């Protein structure tokens, strides 16, 4: 974390946001749900197709916007040096998608959901759209950077929220001066730096209620069992 802070120029960025407020723009019942599959819907594998369909089925009044290689520039403006490093394979598509989701949330607000999330109930029954921030605050089954306080695969906030603003500054500062990532969990470490140093972000993250989440990946090679599915969906 210390190395990431130094390489990202965290000291000056933290100073910029230290006394900032969260910005109380609500998530809203009609904000977009952002899902990314770079190759487009026609090239989704079966699991992603099912998850994407579940998001649309449970979206309520939220428009579901699929971000692809062909349309992402309609919604997000990225610095030329970032796009060049993606083209040169210095930034992987995985880490580019980290910046893309933060860019979308900062500029438009909304809900980011990874393409392999299966929705089993309506989005607005999972979170309160009148709040300004939501993520999956859960009891961690193992020790990691987030320790259950957040997940980067599901984040929701209103437009111009302080967290994506801080994270985007950190991402851009890092990649302006470096050609490779220092750890796969770079995104989580940036959130951790924000959580530990920006009081408004600490308060915002801590305000999210505890949520039960289920990991279906361990069941991928097992026959479908309706009872087990009901338990996962409870």
Which residues does each predicted region cover?
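Small-residue hinge/turn detector
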Residues: 98-108
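Active-site acidic Asp-centered loop
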Residues: 108, 113-115
